[in-house]
Amino acid sequence: YIAAEGPDGLYLIDQHSAHERILFEKMVEEMNGRIVSQMLLEPRVIHLNASLMEAFEAQKETLLSIGFKVEPFGVDSIRVEAIPSVIQHLDVGEAILAALERDDEDQNLIEQTIEKKIISRICKHAAIKGGQVLSMQEQEKLIRDLENCESPRTCPHGRPTMIYLSVDMLARQFGRLGSR
């Protein structure tokens, strides 16, 4: 978690949920504009079980529309040549599996398009992990990026990205309410 002082109190930021929101909005913005894909140095072949291969066939066009360059490769494999640049740090196999696997949290995404559901699953895997140590610069960048989001208070699954503690609440907790 990141603790950040605001003008009238303190914000506790869940770095995973915040980064998930940031990545989600960047990918949706790219999907609605010019998609930037990162070509892989070498195409990656990923073997899929029958149900994932079926999911791939059903979602192939969606994957293409969000920045993947992917095609069937034999009976039980796919070949990935590019991934969305926003998630270029994520393992290619993990990105594909995140896109294709069903997630229990998808039920919270009823109003979202299939593209946004897939993007949400990918961002969940691509986001900074809870407990991961971030440098001060990384924390500051995360906070700035979150401030620029359209919906900075929740991740795409609806969990809060931050908790606000007012100066009055802090003063009460420290027994200083009447001492000002």
Question: Where in the sequence are the language-model features?
Answer:
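Long, charged low-complexity intrinsically disordered regions
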Residues: 1-180
